[in-house]
Amino acid sequence: MNEECLVDVDGLLVNDFLRAENVRAAMKYQPREDDVFIATYPKCGTTWTQYIVCNIFTHGNAPNNVTDFLVQAPYFDFMGADATTKMPRPGALMTHLPFNMRCHSNKAKYIYVARNPYDCAVSYYHYLLGHTPKTCADVSFETFIQAFVNGRVPYGDFFDHLLPWYEHRHDPNVLFFTYEELKKDTRAWVLKIADFLDKTKYGDALREDEKLFQKILDACSLGNMREVFNCGCDTFVSSLLALPEEGRLQSMEIYRTNPLSKKESHEGSGRVRKGKIGDWKNHFTTSELREKMKSWIEEKTKHSDVMRLWADINLPSH
């Protein structure tokens, strides 16, 4: 894809719509004991998990527009540490920052969602198309996969992000699961998430109120989420800047003086796409592409059993 759309912030590649000041503020933030973080590599079920957590915290009354959602569940890297001061609590902070590029706490709670690298790559490709200017002519999937396996995409290498979190998957303050598990049994995992957040307050409440449980499941359906998250980055930047003064984030003011690029972009997928398992089969259609991925995966995971997470979904053998 187009490396002009990447910005290096202290060794971390990020999308050029992020501002270095806010990324650094997120990196340096010292977590509070009541903080809940949703940590993922991009396009691994981030928004879905955020919305589930929001609905659990609000007893099924999560925001139905992106602006209110971002105030309640801030994209930390984008909005900066200032977002923690205006966020209603309980709330959840979403971050794509790698494990070793942010301050960790043994008392805050972390939800990490992993997705198989093939489907992640496909979803990431379609998402980044929407952030690639039309002046970039080569937007083929083949070109993207070369950048993906080289770590020349926002937030760097997939496994460099996943493996440190995988090593912490059994920590008592970490809930680690896969997108595929969430997709296959959403009901069970919503309950596990609720128990992790607070079994008495949220988990037991869902067990005792089937109507509430179903309300949350319906709200977090793919169809409903497409309606809620149907706008682009420029829209939610402008809407955050238009908040009343008492709710406005100082960290977002940088977008007034350093606004987003107005270049016309290729058509991308937005924040919510197909939500399918196995769409990779429609994209990795050549032996060259499959071998490139297999070689990369074998090299990156030679000292880890992490690929066992997806032993049951018929990925290419490794």
Where are these regions (language model features)?
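PAPS-dependent sulfotransferase catalytic domain
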Residues: 1-177, 197, 202-203, 256-318
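Phosphate-binding beta-loop-alpha motif at adenosine-nucleotide cofactor sites
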Residues: 39, 170-196, 227, 231, ...
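Amphipathic alpha-helical interface elements that mediate macromolecular binding in regulatory proteins
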Residues: 47, 51, 163, 184-191, ...
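Helix N-cap and loop-to-helix transition residues
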Residues: 140, 178, 185, 209, ...
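Short, surface-exposed acidic
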Residues: 199-218, 225, 303-306
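PAPS-dependent sulfotransferase catalytic core
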Residues: 212-294
